[in-house]
Amino acid sequence: MAKTIKVIRKKDPKKKNLSDPLAKQKLVWKIGHVLTLVFGLLFSITYFYHVLIFFKYRSWKWLFLRVNKNYSFIQSKRWYMKLLSWSPQVMYRLSLIGVFMSESVTMQQNWVGLNPTWNDLLSSENFHTLLIACLWFFGGGKSFYKILPYMILSYLHLTKMNYELNANKEEKIPLTPKDRKMLHLLAYSELLVILALTLDTILFKTGTSGFMLVIYVGIYWLRLNFSPYAQVAVLELLVKFEKYVPKKYRDKWQVIKNFIYMKMKEHEKRTEEVARYA
């Protein structure tokens, strides 16, 4: 009797990803960060070009503080030119949609199998990021400074993409000196948003600037309580400007510094507890 030959079929490497239950989520995560970075950069180009031609839509009689709302960058009345004039707004929205996509996947993975409380969500940096993105998406007014933190964050995630998608939750992502500088820039860019919103409120740039400033400061207060890089950035600023503070206010200044120190210690303690019971 002839022996039967058992045919062993090799798995197609292209079909390997189909067996990954998280393949779709990883794809959404990658697309989200790409949208944020690409459309954020494209919007930034249009934004700074608009800044360079400020003299065309701002009156010198009002020290360039008053904006001519009837001015249009594209003067043609053709329908396709009208659509083109909306391109900065579309790019701005698409960059924020990318934030919704990537952060939603990250939060879903962080809380899978769990039932997070409101306290858990309010202490989550990813939830803060989503809240701020919703504020910019629905609050009106587009600005480079508002999406700059998201572009930096997406750049960091995409450069570490292969490691993040394949590493276990317990593994820490190695940070290079360049990554630390980018995180430092990210923290300061979030503080820059407060300054930009304050100027918009003082100059009455939009009718909602004041409300957005109050809401953003409220969310940033949460970040200051739970985000280590935000705490480090604020503490560095407090130390830098301490020498300019009058002596009679030094005690109050020290109280603020002690508060930041306390929050940093609490974060270290929480991290140690999580590592211990993980």
From Swiss-Prot:
- Residues in compartment: Cytoplasmic: 1-34, 151-180, 223-278
An example GO biological process term is:
membrane organization
TM ranges: 35-55, 130-150, 181-201, 206-222
Which locations, inside or outside the cell, does it occupy?
Cell membrane
Q: Specify the domain of life of the species encoding this protein.
A: Eukaryota
Which stretches face the Extracellular side? 56-129, 202-205
Family annotation (InterPro entries): PER33/POM33_regulator (IPR051645)
Cellular component per GO? cell periphery; endoplasmic reticulum; plasma membrane
Topology relative to the membrane, per the entry?
A: Multi-pass membrane protein
Q: Where this protein primarily resides, as one coarse class?
A: membrane
Keywords recorded for this protein, A-Z = Cell membrane, Membrane, Transmembrane, Transmembrane helix
Identify this protein by name: Uncharacterized membrane protein YGR026W
Organism this protein belongs to: Saccharomyces cerevisiae (strain ATCC 204508 / S288c)
